[in-house]
Amino acid sequence: KYTSQLVTYGQEVRKAFDTLTSNVSRPVSINFFSLYVNEAALLHQIENAIEKAKSYELFMAIMLGRNDEEMNELKTIASHASNDERFTNVVFMVFDATFGDDNYERFIEYMANAQCASRHNLADQRAAHDKNAQAMISDWMKEVRRSNFSVYVKGESETFSTMKLATAVNVGIAPKVFSRGAETLDLLRTRAPKTFWKNQQAKETAKNILMFNTYDEIIGKATGPALPLKFLFQDAVDDNLHWKENVDKENHPLYLVSEFVSRKIKNADKAKEFNLAEKFIELTRAPYGLFPSYAGIAMLSFAMRPWINKIYSVDGKPRLAQHLVDDVMETFKSWENGKPSNKITFTFETKEAGQLSKLLIKVFKLKSLKTYSDISSLKDARWAISHEYTAEKGY
C-alpha cells in the first residue's frame, strides 16, 4: 500500500494545489507522486506523465510523503533525478509536512469501513466514513500550506515557504526552465497581470505587430490586458522596430525568438515546401515555451515581420502582412491541437526565380493582361503565359 492512495482519494489534494498555483503566470502541469515499488518505477511514472503534458507547461512533480523517512527518501530521489537529462525541465517539489503513520492507519480504517458499508448498501455510513477520510486529507493540506517545500531543478535545490509557492515559481523557477521565455523579463513579469498570461488566441496583437511599422503604432494599439506588451519591446527595438544597439542578444526573449525563426528559414531547403508549425515546433518547448497568449503571439508575429512578401503559398502567391496574421494564428492552433495544418505550408522563391519572373512580366507585358494581371511569382508568370497570354494572342 502506497501513500498515493491518500493523494488520489477525492479532490482535496488537487484543490489545494490548484489554489496554491492559481497565481502562477505560465500554464502548469501538476502531477502527484509518492514512493512506489522502487526508484526506477517511480521515475518511469514521471516519464509517462511528462509525455501527457503540453511542452510549454511547467511540469511540476509534487512529491508527498507519509512520514519523515519517506519524505527524506523522496528528497534524495528528486535530487538525483534533477541531474538526469530525462528530467532536465522537471520541477521536483518535496513537501516537509507529512501525513503521519498514525493518521495513515486511521485513514485506511475509514476507507475499509466505507467500502464495507458500500457493499452492504449502507449509504449513510459509507458517506460518514468517506467524509472522515476526506477531512483527514483536508487537515493535511492545511499543514502542507503552513510548512516549507524543497525544489529540485536542473541539479540545484532551494527551500521555500509553501504559502509563497506561486511567487517562487514566477520569480525563480519558471525562468530557470524557460530561460528564453517572456517571463525572464523582470518588468514584464512583475507588472503584467494574470490576464496578460492567459491562454488565448490574441489575433489583434498579431495584426497590430504585422500591419504597423513603428513602435508607437504597435504599443498605441496595445490596450487593456495587452498593455504590458510595451515591456516586451521597449528595451529591444527602436521607434522604427529595428534592434537597439544595446539589445541583450544573449537573453532578451524577443531577440532570441526572432533569431530562431530567422535561422530556421534561412537554413531551410529552398527547393522544398516549408510548414511553419513543424519547422518552429521547438519554440513550444523549453527554453522558449511559446504558448497562445499576448506575449507568445507577439514574439512569433514580430519574428515573422522580415518575411513579409518573402514566402509564398503553394499557388505561388506571396504572403503579405495580412496573410501572415492568419498564418501565425494557424501555427499556434496547430501546436495547440497537435495536428498538422496544410494552411501554413509554404514555398520560397530563389533570387534567380524572382529575376526571371520580373523579366517574363516585362517581355510579355503580363501586367497588362485583361483577365490575369496579378502576377507576383515565377509560377504565376508561367501560368499567365501558357494560359492567358497565348489565349489573347490567339495561339
What label would you give each PLM region?
Residues K1-Y395:
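Extended alpha-helical scaffold and adjacent linker segments that couple domains
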